[in-house]
Structure formats: C-alpha cells, structure tokens
C-alpha cells in the first residue's frame, strides 16, 4: 500500500514538472507535527503574550485568541484546498504562479521566503531568551542582567548573539547531517508540546496564588497601553484599536503552518495529508493554546500588577506560583526544549521553500541552492544559507520584536496572495481540485481568509512596529522595479503546459542518481 501511495505521489509530482529528489519519509502525523511544532504555542504563546495582555488585559487573551484563531483556521482551510491540488515544496509560491501568473507567484515567493527567514530569527532569539530567563535565571539562579546577555537597540550583547548563533547552527547541522533524527525530533515535538502545555496549564491553575479563580478576567477589557502595560504598546485612546493590534499575539503564534506544504514532496499521500496536517495543526494549537494563555491570566496574583511587568510578565507570573520548585524547574526545561524543536522545524521549512524557488531559477545562485545531497536527500546549501540569513537578521539589536511582527506580516501576505488568486481562477483556469475540496464553501471561505489574513497582517506594522510597515512598502516597491527591469524577461516561472512534457526526460535523468 505504501509503495502504491509513493508511486502515486511521484506521478503527481511528475505531472507538475518536478523530479522526486527529496526523500518521501514523512507520515501524515509527521506532516502535522512539523506545522504544529513551528506554530508551537509554547513559543509565541509565551514570548508574544504581552502583545495582547499589555493592550487590553484579560479580554485581549480570552476573546482575542479565539478571534485570531478562527481567522487563522479559515486561512488554513483555504490554503489546504490549494495544497491538495498542487502538493509541491514551493507551496504558496507555486500556487500563486499557477493561479495568478508568473509575477504574482514571484512576489509571493519573496514575501514567503523572507517571512520564513524571519521566523527562524525570531524563534531562535526567543529560544535563547527563554533559556536565559527560565533555565539560567529561573533554575540555576544565575545573574543574566548584564548588557552582554541582552538584545539592545544597537549591537546585541556578545553572549546573546553567540547564544542565538549556536542555536541556529545546531538546527542547520541537524537538518544537514541528521534528517532522519530531525524527523523523529519533529514528531516528538508534537507530543512534547501537548504534554508541556497541558501540564503547565493544570499546574498554574492548581497552584495559583489566589483565593479563587476569577474567570471574569477573561472578558474584562482594560486599557493597559502605555506605561500601564510596561511600555509594550504605545498609549492608545481607542480600546478597539488596542484590541485589534493585540491580535499580533495570535498572528505571531499561529503562523508557519505552510510548513506542511513545503514538505509535500517528503510526505506520503501528500494530497490528503498536507491539507489535513495544515488545518489540524492550526485547530489543535488554537484549542490547547487557548486554555494555556487563559491560565496565565487566571493564575496572576493581580492583573494590573501583571500588566505593569511588560515583557517580564510570564516569568513574574510563574515565579509567583506556589507550585513546588522541582515541578516549576521541569516545566521551565520543557518549555525551552519545545521552543528549540520549533526552531529546528523552522529551518526545515525555510530550506525547502528556498530549494523549490531556486530549482525554478528564482534566486541568485539558483544552481547551488537547488542542489540536493544524493546521500542524504536534503537541500544542503539551502539549509545553510537559510541559517546564515537568519543569523544576519539578528544583528539588529531590537531584533525580536521587529522580527516577530515581520515574520507574521510577511507570511500572512504570502498566505493571502494565492488564496486571492484562487478566487478568480476557480472554475476557469483552476478546474481540477484535489481530494480536499471545500465545494460550495470554497469561495466564501477564500474571501473570509483574504479579509482575515489582511487584518492579521495589518496589525503587525502598527506602533511600535512601524519599521515592519516600512519594510513591506520598501520591499513591494523594490520587487516591482526589479520585476520590470529584469525578472519579467528572465524568470520563466513554474513548469506549465508543454514545458512539463519537455521536462520528463530530465526528470528521469535526475531520479537515476537516487536509485529510486
């Protein structure tokens, strides 16, 4: 049965003009796990928690998480339907090219690729931040207050920079030399996230330093912008504006699920398992993440005092708990380990997208970036270039906040683009769908996905993240100029029509190297 499935997957890939170069080693659970790992509610749900809590207090969590989560789920359904039709490593870029044309696909590729690079940067910066605060400070009681440990507005502290660098290098090395181990670790991360999130939620509620749990906190709006929220968000007069901007918590956390698409060529029964892995990763993250972030609010000794902690609110809240020290230490280690595995999966996803764009000659040095190790069946050059770009983007001292918002904005723009193109292509150039077919709900869901995705992208460049907005505008202008100056005539795009037929001999020659 597995052989028939793999032959079918290979046949589908050939029909789109590509050879089976990557090892198809991933099960349906593995495909789910990579997106679930990158979403990692123990990453964004913790490090980005102040975005919402320091905006509108408990309601920003109790109501905001559900609002943002539902929109993310709608986007995942719309993306899943397209992924079922075109299961390639290029993912969004490939879909946009087929449904919206070469230029649309090329622009999508750049937003998606930069978003994925920023994901690695922000996640791995977050890993070090959590390791520093939870393990070194929380477990071993080390003094990590010195400038060398911090990411300042200028050049980051040397210990901070070295720590983030070591984490990124280790992720690249595992992806290069131990892809089988990487897959096992990514699968493990699914269980780790479930176990740690559930344990953390129950422990915080059981050992909350309050006489009784006040559930009204979860729907009580309080304007904590400005100094009241530790300066996380600039002062805002409108509570509605603050609430919408606070959705950045969900935008940053529930993102990166395009990883299921980028590993399509490594997944069994890709047309079925990729869309399922995508929407299930979002759904379970939304549900389990909701209980977890709500427990943060309920377990606080005082909401007003908690908001005043700003970025330190999670460490303050957990330190205030009455849970036994060994349990607290174990949870600290579990949180950091889950975040580390999240970063590992991020490198996998980014390198696959880079490889796919390069094999269509979309990048400088495409020949090298699209090369695949015959022995290991992984795009080795793309792995290390992804890691290098992620590290370089960390050289900006205030990296974490900007990169957190940047990755969310860039990714949601790239999510919206193929879905928007699909609205106009469906029933015209997009006739044959895969097994995951939304039927009559297809266009309504796509329209909601585009609107919701744009809102989630918009919140990412509101103050204090204006720099992200400038990046989006600057990149858009640069890409338009570059397209008309050279890429319009140079870049051929994804294989279509007669080009697919012409590539069949080349595909056969490529696959001979791998003894399939």
Each model region followed by its residue ranges:
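Terminal cytosolic tails of multi-pass membrane transporters
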Residues: 1-26, 422-444, 464-516
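Hydrophobic, membrane-embedded alpha-helices of multi-pass small-molecule transporters
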Residues: 26, 30-46, 77, 163-170, ...
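Hydrophobic transmembrane alpha-helices that form the core helical bundles
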Residues: 47-51, 63-64, 73-168, 173-176, ...
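Transmembrane helix-loop boundary segments of multi-pass membrane transporters
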Residues: 51-61, 130, 136-139, 143-157, ...
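TM-loop-TM module centered on a large, flexible mid-protein loop between adjacent transmembrane helices
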Residues: 94-96, 101, 132-144, 221-234, ...
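Hydrophobic alpha-helical segments and their helix-loop junctions in multi-pass secondary transporters
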Residues: 129-136, 191-228, 294-300, 415-430, ...
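Membrane-interface loop-to-helix entry segments
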Residues: 131, 159-220, 278-282, 287, ...
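C-terminal membrane-solvent junction of multi-pass transporters and transport-like membrane proteins
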Residues: 159, 185-189, 367-377, 415-468, ...
